[in-house]
């Protein structure tokens, strides 16, 4: 794999059962020169356990979460998990965080969703305090007060430093963000952005959001050293129509079924691309139980906006378009070790 845009492998979160070939995929990614292997979590399998398990057989590839649920762990618990994996992997961990949506946050994790931007900022500040290990960790809140005081507490809480000395105080933090304010926040306080449903056609809009964050006082990074690790479905095929048909049910789920009807950040991504009418109709059909119809009405051009599907020459050219748009790492999925190797040969 030549220098330039890097590749990441997205293992995602599990379905009904653990996947059978992920150890093989991780080994193939390590051998083929992939930069990073990512795991995710929602309301089933967690991200850290499989990343540690499969990552234990690797020596080079970075091990990232894309993403862990911010509401699943307190900031200090998150920092502990991250510093532990960073030690075990010899300094190869990337912490990817996401706020999810109110249905999952309040319905599964039992946490309050409002003020996601403020919560994220406070959360990351505490995580970095833990890793810095310069003084006992404190936070004035209002979302994560440390030590916790006030009504219902004993008043005995004590500010603490982590027992374990982190291997790195600067473990990279990336943010899964879709809206303008969250993307700007990623540029301001994080080391990278983890976009889903990225479209190079919209790069100008994304750059405005990012530049707002880079321009803020005290911004952590600049354009030159900030990573954009975009998730992309890449399908090498001579039958684009069949591939599009296979992707549309997935898009219908995310546009129509993920999140509440009036609060679906994935749907908002496609609205910003100019597909408001399609999104509204997909949502209506999906939520009325007509899921097949919801997928069928999605136009090919909507699919093509945020995926790469075609023969090898087309895929290679489109990957160059994504790189020119500012993507530093394309995070892909693969069903076999052969597909991992085929993708690695394209960059």
Swiss-Prot record:
The keyword ATP-binding does not apply. Gene3D superfamilies: Luciferase-like domain. It is an enzyme of class 1 (oxidoreductase). Its EC number is 1.-.-.-. Signal peptide: none annotated. Keywords: Oxidoreductase. GO terms for molecular function: oxidoreductase activity, acting on paired donors, with incorporation or reduction of molecular oxygen. The keyword Oxidoreductase applies. GO terms for cellular component: peptidoglycan-based cell wall; plasma membrane. Coiled coil: none annotated. PANTHER family: 5,10-METHYLENETETRAHYDROMETHANOPTERIN REDUCTASE (PTHR43244:SF1), PTHR43244. This is Putative coenzyme F420-dependent oxidoreductase Rv3520c. The lineage of its organism: Bacteria, Bacillati, Actinomycetota, Actinomycetes, Mycobacteriales.
């Amino acid at each position: 794999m030549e220098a330039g845009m890097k590749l990441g492998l997205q293992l995602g979160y599990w379905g009904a059962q653990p996947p059978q070939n992920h150890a093989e995929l991780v080994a193939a990614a390590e051998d083929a020169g992939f930069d990073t292997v990512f795991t995710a979590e929602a309301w089933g399998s967690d991200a850290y356990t499989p990343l540690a398990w499969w990552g234990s057989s690797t020596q080079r590839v970075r091990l990232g979460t894309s993403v862990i649920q911010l509401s699943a762990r307190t900031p200090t618990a998150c920092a502990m998990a991250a510093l532990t994996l960073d030690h075990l992997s010899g300094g190869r961990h990337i912490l990817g965080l996401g706020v999810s949506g109110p249905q999952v946050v309040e319905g599964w994790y039992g946490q309050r969703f409002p003020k996601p931007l403020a919560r994220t900022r406070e959360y990351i500040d505490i995580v970095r305090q833990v890793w810095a290990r310069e003084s006992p960790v404190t936070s004035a809140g209002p979302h994560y007060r440390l030590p916790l005081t006030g009504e219902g507490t004993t008043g005995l809480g004590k500010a603490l430093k982590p027992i374990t000395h982190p291997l790195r105080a600067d473990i990279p933090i990336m943010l899964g963000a879709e809206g303008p304010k969250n993307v700007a926040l990623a540029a301001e306080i994080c080391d990278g952005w983890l976009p889903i449903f990225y479209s190079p056609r919209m790069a100008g809009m994304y750059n405005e959001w990012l530049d707002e964050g880079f321009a803020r006082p005290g911004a952590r990074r600049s354009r030159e050293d900030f990573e954009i690790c975009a998730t992309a479905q890449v399908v090498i095929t001579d039958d684009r129509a069949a591939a599009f048909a296979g992707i549309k049910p997935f898009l219908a789920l995310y546009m129509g079924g993920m999140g509440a009807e009036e609060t679906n950040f994935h749907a908002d991504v496609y609205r910003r691309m100019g597909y408001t009418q399609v999104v509204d109709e997909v949502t209506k059909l999906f939520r009325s139980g007509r899921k097949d119809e919801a997928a069928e009405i999605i136009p090919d051009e909507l699919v093509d906006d945020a995926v790469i599907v075609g023969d090898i020459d087309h895929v290679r050219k489109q990957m160059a378009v994504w790189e020119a748009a500012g993507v530093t790492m394309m995070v892909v999925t693969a069903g076999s070790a052969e597909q991992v190797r085929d993708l690695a040969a394209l960059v």
